[in-house]
Structures are given as structure tokens and as C-alpha cells.
Amino acid sequence: MASLIYRQLLTNSYTVDLSDEIQEIGSTKSQNVTINPGPFAQTGYAPVNWGPGEINDSTTVEPLLDGPYQPTTFNPPVDYWMLLAPTTPGVIVEGTNNTDRWLATILIEPNVQSENRTYTIFGIQEQLTVSNTSQDQWKFIDVVKTTANGSIGQYGPLLSSPKLYAVMKHNEKLYTYEGQTPNARTAHYSTTNYDSVNMTAFCDFYIIPRSEESKCTEYINNGLPPIQNTRNVVPLSLTARDVIHYRAQANEDIVISKTSLWKEMQYNRDITIRFKFANTIIKSGGLGYKWSEISFKPANYQYTYTRDGEEVTAHTTCSVNGVNDFSFNGGYLPTDFVVSKFEVIKENSYVYIDYWDDSQAFRNVVYVRSLAANLNSVMCTGGSYNFSLPVGQWPVLTGGAVSLHSAGVTLSTQFTDFVSLNSLRFRFRLAVEEPHFKLTRTRLDRLYGLPAADPNNGKEYYEIAGRFSLISLVPSNDDYQTPIANSVTVRQDLERQLGELREEFNALSQEIAMSQLIDLALLPLDMFSMFSGIKSTIDAAKSMATNVMKKFKKSGLANSVSTLTDSLSDAASSISRGSSIRSIGSSASAWTDVSTQITDISSSVSSVSTQTSTISRRLRLKEMATQTEGMNFDDISAAVLKTKIDKSTQISPNTIPDIVTEASEKFIPNRAYRVINNDDVFEAGIDGKFFAYKVDTFEEIPFDVQKFADLVTDSPVISAIIDFKTLKNLNDNYGITKQQAFNLLRSDPRVLREFINQDNPIIRNRIEQLIMQCRL
């Protein structure tokens, strides 16, 4: 099928000529050395007139949509919408102040003639006459009574296509929606003690601040946007360069050689590097108990200092690479304290400092050799950050320290529209130091590294003293400046092309026809057919294929294959050394990474979620190794890639290697895989969600993680193209046979095409979601 292109690249990407490898090393030695270079590093744009640089601050952002949360009973805060997303008809929410207002909302499916139904409302069986004459829209009805045992009246109907409803407490009223989508509007009911109204939700719900009411109305009328994970950070592996020592004065310019037009100058300089870290703190929406991200960001700093009686103006940019992600999850309720991710730099991380000053040494840093630097070390100690909770004692992230040690220096170039500034990039390796860091009032304690919460600890800057030496080829006439070599701008132009191409690729997702996509996903796409639509491909087929394979060799998918191969080799050698396969690690451990934890499984949901997530991240490779007749995520990914390549007006042989590699890593980030055991299905996603259910009834059963780990070792692994929630929704609304269920579980392309040709909205919506996840 279409995923043949990825398997072909994995097979052939390790055949590279030595001369090509040497050329690759030479061209990328000082390029793309950090995943987050910032606005003043390598290929960024620097200002023409230097300003004071960025102010190191923390930004708190309240996201628009917080959730989804599970059904629960709680007192929602005033001025926040509860956006309800029910999947089945019936009572979806209840709310009362226990004095004079009892309000509930019921959902009625389409095409219901007037009939009597029994609903359990506030614990009492109530007979209601309901109807919904619409053929394609669902109907929400508010049922209201003013005493606990009084009669019920029906108010404020809402006819909805997206099947969404919302309620909010504001200004001594309960606000809801009424009318008909896509023109639904707000309505309200007056109530006393409105701030004490408890809500009981019987379906998943989201929380949206009243300041974003227009967005809430947009969701009510048009539906929720696709929920996607767009963050993709791949740390690079770096090797420190040896530092070359020179016997020279600290500050001097030496003429090494001279001809009529050119001369070689050796510049030796004492330098003082001052830098600081910057961070971003993003607080989740909702009730104020959750933080989504605490991360490092590039920090610019401009300063002056005196060198041999001369005042020097300098500018630095500090960025980090190879960060470590930590998290804390206090529970799953809206009032449980959660930090989804906070970054920490440790001994496996690197710090980059780009340095430029206004001295003669940086005027002609273009053709350079014999570049070396000696720098002192510096200790960076973290401060404290208070997590300001609405109620209760505040957790505090405090402590942590690392020391920076020089690990090499390279050239970097900063571009503007008018001038090009040539800088030195100093690379520092890290060592962890005392004190350790901890998150008070939680289990996180005695951890080492420097968290991003307060990396400067109140200091204006950190300072490093040292010196550098370089030999530069410059014009003999000191009034001339060395022209910038054309090769310097190659990577910058390519990055600009890639940026424009990524925007075009993401926009093309709206133009893909699903029926054609399924047919294309079934074709065996190889290197030639994948790139046949690109102009001048045939003339440059060999060189372009080689470039694609070289780039793909460094992709996350190729690295995963290498890691898995090593794990399988270790497992095989372990088996030969002992009698008990399970006790010393079997091939199952290579696929799942949890064989050592299987015997000590916690009964908590978070433990099972972590283990299933760990297993699921390996199942993409397992599925590639044991192909089935069903369609998989990589078939869809490759088909979308082929379609976008054919439709693109900006694609070229130069950008193809980066685009193919990015597509293999970033397309469809939210994947789930399943294994089938008789009539039982086990399904797990890389996001930690897991389900076990019966094929014929879709009734959920207990999830046995040990059985799941055994099955993924011995049984075929199948991409959950149509996931469990979609299948259950399809069965509840349309009803499907057991054979149809099996075919959908096996991702049978013939059955998928039938449902799409029948214009089934549930299946089409699921495929559309997968296509929208194919973004760069």
C-alpha cells in the first residue's frame, strides 16, 4: 500500500556514499544546531538598530477551550460557560439552587414524532411528551420547575447540528442557548442564589471564559475544531569540539600573510559574555488549578563593557537544546493541581550563546580558519515559582542548579534586510549541581537540573569571562569590508522556502477528496511514483532520491528503528544466557518496554495509561514489520503527502527531503492501535487512552495490560483508523452488523470506501479529522 514509500526509505536510507557524507558534514557543521534558535541565532533576523533586547518576563495565557472533563457534579464558577458535548439522547445536565429553581436539559434525537417518555430528573421519574420533527438536527429542551415536587414546563428549544449545548451563571441568571443552528442565540432564566447553583453533567464538557463568549457561540453553531497535538520537538545529538590553544596576547591584531588585495589577520580578544535565560509560563483555562507549559525561550541581552580601555557594545542571544520534559498530575478533576509539562535542562542538554560586538574582529568574520576559544565555567542557580491556586496552599517549584562548561565555538550569521552580522556561537555542555529542585506539597522531590520556572533567580544576567582567537581573510585595504559569500545565505533561503511550503501544505488539507484518498492509499507508492508529479524530477531522480534517503536517515522514525533493533538484539542475547525468558526480558520487552513493570502493575488509571502509552509508541514499527491487508495510518499519511505534492505549486527537489522527513514524523500525531483476540478488542493510543470491549455489543470490559502486552508481541497490530468512540457512535446511531464491525476493526479499505460513498457523516468526519492532522 501507500506506506511502502516509508518502508522503502527505511530500507535504503543507510546506503550513502562517503563523499556525500563528508559534503553533508561540511555544509551543516554550523547550521541548524539548535531546535529553537530564536530571533537572533543562525538564520533569524536581527534589528538594524540595536535596542535593549527582550525583557525577561513570564507570560500567562488563558487558553480558549479547556477540557474535555468527565461527567461530574460541582459548583462551576461564575462567568464561565460549561460547553456540553453529549453523544446519546436523554438528560445531559441538571442544576438547582434548592429553593426556587430546578433546571435540567434533555436531548432528543432527530425524527421523533410526539410521544411520551420517562426521564429521571433530580432523582424523580417524570413523564414528558417530547418530539423532534427535524430530519437531521438534534433538539435540546430546557425543563424547569420552581418547587421540588412541582410540575415541569418545557422552554427554550435549540435545534442543533453539532450536538453541543452550553450553560453559564452570570448576573443573577442562568444563561443557555436557544433557536436553531447556525443562528443559535443566548437566553436566560432569573434565579436567586445563582452563585450557589450546583451542576451535574451527564456527558463530557469543556470550560470557556465568558470573555470568549463569541467563540462559544461559534462552537455551538458550527462545532468544535479538531483537537490536535501540534508540538513536535526533536532534540539533536551534539559532540563537543576540541579546543585549540594558542600562545598569543589577549587583545591584538596580527598580520599572518599579505598580498596586493588580501591579507590574513589573526584576532585575539578578551571577551566578557553576559547572558540570561527567558521562559514562557502558560496557564490552562478553567478553574485556575492547571498549568499547561513552562518552557525556555531565547533571550536577548545588550550591554557594554571595557576592554583594554575601549568601551565595547555587545549583544548576546541565549538558547537551549535537548531539554527534558517533566510533569505532575494531581488527578483528573477540574480542581486537581496539574502541570502538564515543565522543561528542565540537565547534563544531556546544551546551552548556546551567540555573541557579537562592534569591534574590528567582527567586521570581517566571513572567511575564517583556526577558530578557538577558552572560557570560564559559570554556575546557574534556579529560584522559586509560586503556583497561585484559587484555594488551598500553593505548590512552589524551587531550587535546581547547573554549571556551564565550554564545549566549542562555531560561526553563526544574523541577517537583516540591509546588513548581515557575523557572530560567534559558543556551545556549553552542562553538569548538574546542588541544590536539587522540588515541587513542594507534591511527590516531586530531590530532582536535579535547572527548571524553566525561574532560571535567573532574580539576577539581571550571568557572566562568563574568556578569550577567543581566529584567523580571517580580509581585504588589504582596511576601508573595505569582505563581501558576504553566496553560500552563507543558502540555508536561509531554503528555510524561507520550507516555511512557505509548510503553509501551502497545511492549507491544501481542505481540498482532498476522501474517496480518491482511499484509492490512493491502496496503491503501492514507491520513490518514483511518489515524486513523479514534480517538475524536472526525472532529470534529477538519482540525486534527489539520495538526498531524501540521507535526510530520512536522521528522522525520528529511522532512529526508532535503530533503537528497536538494538533492543531486539539485547533481548535475543539475554534469552541465550538464561532459562527463563520472562524473567530476563523477552522480545516483548523490545516492543513494549514494560516487561519489567508487568509483574508490579498498579491498579491506578494513571499507571495503566503510562504503560499503554509506552507500548503504543512502539506499535507503529510493529505494524510495519507485520503488514496486514487492512489500511494503516501510514497509508493515509503517504496518500495525503502524495496528493499535496501533486497539488503544490511551490514544491521543488531542494525541499522534498525536508518535507518527506517531516511528514513521516508529524503527520497524524494522535494514533491508536488495536489487537483482536477472538471477540475481545484491546485498543490503546499514544496519548495514554485505552479501551477493551466486545465486538458484537461494543460493551467495555476491564483492560488487562499484561494480556495486551502479550498480544502485541504475538498478534498482528492494526491501526485504529475508525477508533472505538467513532465505532460506538456509529453503532448507536445507525446500527452495524458484527461482520461490518469486524471489517471496520480490521480497517478494511473496501468497507471504509462503502461508508464514504454512502456519505455516512460519522465515518466521513473521522477521516476528515485524520486528514486535518496531516500538518507540518
Curated annotation (Swiss-Prot):
Record flagged with keyword Disulfide bond: yes
Name by which UniProt lists this protein: Outer capsid protein VP4
Cysteines engaged in disulfide bonds, as pairs: C203-C216, C318-C380
UniProt motif (DGE motif) ranges: 308-310
Any Gene Ontology CC annotation: viral outer capsid
Short sequence motif named KID motif, residue ranges: 644-646
Record-stated family: Belongs to the rotavirus VP4 family.
Region (Spike body and stalk (antigen domain)) location: 248-479
Site (Cleavage): R231, N232, R241, D242, R247, A248
Site (Binding to sialic acid) residue list: R101, S190
Any one GO biological process: permeabilization of host organelle membrane involved in viral entry into host cell
Spike head: annotated span: 65-224
First and last residue of the signal peptide: none
Note: In group A rotaviruses, VP4 defines the P serotype. Some rotavirus strains are neuraminidase-sensitive and require sialic acid to attach to the cell surface. Some rotavirus strains are integrin-dependent. Some rotavirus strains depend on ganglioside for their entry into the host cell. Hsp70 also seems to be involved in the entry of some strains.
Keyword entries, A-Z: Capsid protein, Coiled coil, Disulfide bond, Hemagglutinin, Host cell membrane, Host cytoplasm, Host cytoskeleton, Host endoplasmic reticulum, Host membrane, Host-virus interaction, Membrane, Outer capsid protein, Viral attachment to host cell, Viral penetration into host cytoplasm, Viral penetration via permeabilization of host membrane, Virion, Virus entry into host cell
Lineage: Viruses, Riboviria, Orthornavirae, Duplornaviricota, Resentoviricetes
UniProt KW Disulfide bond keyword: yes
Organism for this UniProt entry: Rotavirus A (isolate RVA/Monkey/South Africa/SA11-H96/1958/G3P5B[2]) (RV-A)
Ranges where the record places region Hydrophobic: 389-409
Ranges for region Spike foot: 510-776
Coiled coil regions in record: 484-511
Ranges where the record places region DGE motif: 308-310
UniProt motif YGL motif: location: 448-450
